[in-house]
């Protein structure tokens, strides 16, 4: 089995392109990870997700621990077999969802106690339990358990939260079962305070994670402030850097130019289900009546099924009447667009060219 590794093949200014080698195959970077929260990318077959060019997708610890449970998925052979996905899977730690979805939650040094948003059952999620769940799922890349600092936060609030994340990172690292081809990433926190993010990075580097994530951003602070405190330069040059929850094309391009390697976001899938398509000419709201008799495809040179086989008029019709096929085709197109964007970014880095495109 291959060892987990990251090789940078090309670098232009701060932007890098390379290959992450894992037990479940290679990941070309910079990489965009479609979000498969509950063991599925909404409105897509797993093989269709692969056809868009995705090398890796994201699963969610919080949702999978509630339904159908990590133990059941392990009994059935792990998440890869369960959902018929043979490529790498990264699972988040569950911390963000606990904070955002569970209204009745209590944070202590031990972890987070919360009530399920599904049936009200009480749970305790600790660094050890989060790491165990991800191991049961068979995650290729496991995330350390963290507290996603609420925004806005005062300096002292952000410092207290960041220090808790650091202590939890120590426990997550101790609980992680090291195996060839598998990895665990630590998560940098610190809200919008560069000083705290630098300290968080220094603390987590001591734990020698296989990669590092930048968490707690894209939560309302705006692009300018996000880029100001992004701080990938604080992280090791030879390990992957993952900006969590960021997926607007302009944000991806800006973050890559600052040295980030991995991204995930629900934007392409959620937007697709809501009738919004990403194109190189800008976004298209297919619900708009001006597309009712438009016989042209979304993008003539796009190779996705939506563009190769159907007109904007047909997609308009499907979305307006709420047909499932509309959500499927729009999602397929958006995921293809995002993978094409990443491919173009990798090509520009290899050629040593500035990113002269915005979408």
From Swiss-Prot:
GO molecular function ontology, one term from the record: tRNA-guanosine(34) queuine transglycosylase activity
Active site: 92, 264
Cofactor: binding comment: Binds 1 zinc ion per subunit.
Catalysed conversion reaction: 7-aminomethyl-7-carbaguanine + guanosine(34) in tRNA = 7-aminomethyl-7-carbaguanosine(34) in tRNA + guanine
RNA binding: annotated segments: 245-251, 269-273
Recorded metabolic or biological pathway in which this protein acts: tRNA modification; tRNA-queuosine biosynthesis
Binding site for Zn(2+): 302, 304, 307, 333
One GO cellular component term: cytoplasm
Protein's UniProt keywords contain Acetylation: no
Entry's Gene Ontology BP terms: queuosine biosynthetic process; tRNA wobble guanine modification; tRNA-guanine transglycosylation
Cofactor(s) annotated in UniProt: Zn(2+)
Enzyme class: transferase
EC number(s) stated in the UniProt entry for this protein: 2.4.2.29
Residues that, per the record, bind substrate: 92-96, 146, 189, 216
SUPFAM superfamilies assigned to the protein according to its UniProt record, in alphabetical order: tRNA-guanine transglycosylase
UniProt keyword annotations, A-Z: Glycosyltransferase, Metal-binding, Queuosine biosynthesis, Transferase, tRNA processing, Zinc
NCBIfam families the UniProt entry points to: Q_tRNA_tgt, tgt_general
Described function: Catalyzes the base-exchange of a guanine (G) residue with the queuine precursor 7-aminomethyl-7-deazaguanine (PreQ1) at position 34 (anticodon wobble position) in tRNAs with GU(N) anticodons (tRNA-Asp, -Asn, -His and -Tyr). Catalysis occurs through a double-displacement mechanism. The nucleophile active site attacks the C1' of nucleotide 34 to detach the guanine base from the RNA, forming a covalent enzyme-RNA intermediate. The proton acceptor active site deprotonates the incoming PreQ1, allowing a nucleophilic attack on the C1' of the ribose to form the product.
Summary of subunit composition and partner proteins: Homodimer. Within each dimer, one monomer is responsible for RNA recognition and catalysis, while the other monomer binds to the replacement base PreQ1.
Family: Belongs to the queuine tRNA-ribosyltransferase family.
This protein's name: Queuine tRNA-ribosyltransferase
Lineage: Bacteria, Pseudomonadati, Pseudomonadota, Alphaproteobacteria, Rickettsiales
């Amino acid at each position: 089995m291959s060892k987990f590794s990251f090789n940078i093949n090309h670098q232009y200014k701060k932007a890098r392109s390379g290959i992450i080698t894992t037990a479940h195959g290679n990941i070309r970077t910079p990489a965009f990870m479609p979000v498969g929260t509950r063991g599925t990318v909404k409105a897509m077959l797993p093989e269709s997700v692969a056809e868009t060019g995705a090398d890796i997708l994201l699963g969610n610890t919080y949702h999978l621990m509630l339904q159908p449970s990590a133990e059941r998925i392990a009994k059935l052979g792990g998440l890869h077999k369960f959902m018929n996905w043979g490529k790498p899977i990264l699972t988040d730690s569950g911390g963000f969802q606990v904070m955002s979805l569970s209204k009745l939650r209590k944070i202590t040094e031990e972890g987070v106690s919360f009530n399920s948003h599904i049936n009200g059952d009480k749970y305790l999620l600790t660094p050890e339990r989060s790491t165990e769940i991800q191991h049961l799922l068979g995650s290729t890349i496991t995330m350390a358990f963290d507290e996603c600092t609420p925004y806005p936060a005062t300096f002292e609030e952000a410092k207290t939260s960041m220090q808790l994340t650091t202590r939890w990172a120590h426990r997550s690292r101790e609980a992680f079962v090291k195996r060839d081809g598998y990895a665990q990433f630590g998560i940098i926190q610190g809200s919008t305070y560069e000083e705290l993010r630098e300290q968080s990075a220094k603390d987590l580097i001591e734990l020698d994670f296989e990669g590092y994530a930048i968490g707690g951003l894209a939560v309302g602070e705006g692009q300018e402030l996000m880029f100001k405190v992004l701080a990938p330069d604080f992280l090791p040059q030879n390990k992957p850097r993952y900006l969590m929850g960021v997926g607007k094309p302009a944000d991806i391009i800006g973050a890559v130019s600052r040295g980030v390697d991995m991204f995930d976001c629900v934007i392409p899938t959620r937007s697709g289900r809501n009738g919004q398509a990403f194109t190189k000419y800008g976004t298209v709201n297919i619900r708009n009546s001006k597309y009712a008799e438009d016989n042209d495809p979304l993008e003539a040179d796009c190779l996705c099924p939506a563009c190769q086989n159907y007109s904007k008029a047909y997609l308009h019709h499907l979305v307006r009447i709420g047909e499932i096929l509309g959500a499927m085709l729009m999602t397929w197109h958006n995921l293809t667009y995002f993978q094409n964007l990443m491919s173009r970014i990798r090509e520009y880095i290899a050629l040593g060219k500035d990113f002269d495109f915005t979408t």
